[in-house]
């Protein structure tokens, strides 16, 4: 599924990385524990999180995450956005909760990081 479609499903507003809206995404994961993200997430996946710290971006960069969507209208600082822009990492904000975000994407056919539906 294209990143653009995912953002539409989540009613998300892009913050940066608009050039990557045609990115094809196969899997999605949700976590507020960055140690879990580092423990073997799928390259190019979408990360749903409620954390907005700069550590989220650093972790996403190391793990090869394709895009980060902040849930519950959580807005990162300009410093966080600038770091993501420097690595061409798309960021977006969704008004949906983590639960609703996961449910919507599952309903639309997205698979989890383990490939299960």
Regions found by a protein language model. Give the residues of each.
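Feature captures the catalytic cores and cofactor-binding loops of soluble hydro-lyases/lyases
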Residues: 22-23, 27-46, 50-117
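N-terminal, charge-rich interaction modules
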Residues: 1-21
């Amino acid at each position: 599924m294209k990143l653009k479609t995912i953002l539409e499903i989540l009613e998300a507003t892009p913050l940066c990385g608009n050039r990557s809206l045609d990115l094809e995404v196969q899997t999605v994961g949700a976590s507020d524990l960055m140690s879990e993200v580092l423990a073997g997430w799928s390259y190019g996946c979408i990360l749903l999180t409620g954390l907005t710290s700069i550590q989220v971006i650093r972790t996403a960069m190391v793990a090869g995450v394709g895009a980060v969507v902040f849930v519950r209208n959580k807005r990162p600082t300009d410093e966080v956005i600038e770091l993501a822009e420097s690595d061409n990492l798309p960021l977006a904000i969704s008004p949906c909760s983590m639960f609703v975000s996961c449910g919507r994407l599952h309903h639309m056919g997205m698979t989890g990081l383990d490939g299960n539906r």
